[in-house]
């Protein structure tokens, strides 16, 4: 089993589209069982999108759902509940036992709280997952990545690689000015797997698979290998 946590520098950084692109590529080329696990979702969006894109071709797991689009402990408290970390772990173990690939989509960034004293970074460390960090390609992305990679190392995470995501259309000139790959790799001491281009048809599985293909080719043998799972 290969498992990986896809985290972002913030809410709306491109985690969901990246997970979908990687899953679409996997289903098209590996043809072995895969799952996307969204441990906690607050408000509608991600799981519904995945189910629209993949239907029955992919297991979409969401053990905890809360109505309010807030940080998980606050959303849970509104419903008189708490975030059961043990339930999340059980769901991951069950997914790992039955799938060749489990993409775990984080909530917000690595510092996002899952409980009152537990963050996404704690989950990544406790579950011993390699982390793929995605950041939106815009002005300021270099500083965001430097800050987040520093935080990840301070938390003793297995931060393995970076991805840039065009959440909006970006020109070649803007890409070069805002996100110089050599500069990012020098400062973060991590490989940039590539740029996930903006997709006009984000529910098109073929387009998603094509977008994920370059990232998978770069990641092969380093991030998503059964030995690391």
From Swiss-Prot:
Pathway of action: Cofactor biosynthesis; biotin biosynthesis; biotin from 7,8-diaminononanoate: step 1/2
Residues at which Mg(2+) binds: 16, 46, 105
Cofactor(s) the record lists: Mg(2+)
Active site per the UniProt annotation: 38
Native organism taxonomy: Bacteria, Bacillati, Cyanobacteriota, Cyanophyceae, Gloeobacterales
Keywords recorded for this protein, A-Z: ATP-binding, Biotin biosynthesis, Cytoplasm, Ligase, Magnesium, Metal-binding, Nucleotide-binding
Recorded GO MF terms: ATP binding; dethiobiotin synthase activity; magnesium ion binding
Protein name per UniProt: ATP-dependent dethiobiotin synthetase BioD
Family: Belongs to the dethiobiotin synthetase family.
Superkingdom as given in the UniProt entry: Bacteria
Signal peptide feature range: none
Top enzyme class: ligase
Annotated localization: Cytoplasm
Source organism of this protein record: Gloeobacter violaceus (strain ATCC 29082 / PCC 7421)
EC number: 6.3.3.3
GN (gene name): bioD
Presence of keyword tRNA-binding: no
Subunit and partners: Homodimer.
Pfam family, one: AAA_26
GO BP term, pick one: biotin biosynthetic process
Function: Catalyzes a mechanistically unusual reaction, the ATP-dependent insertion of CO2 between the N7 and N8 nitrogen atoms of 7,8-diaminopelargonic acid (DAPA, also called 7,8-diammoniononanoate) to form a ureido ring. This cyanobacterium does not encode bioA (which catalyzes the formation of the precursor for this reaction in the cannonical pathway), instead it encodes bioU, which replaces bioA and also performs the first half of the cannonical BioD reaction. Thus in this organism BioD has a different substrate.
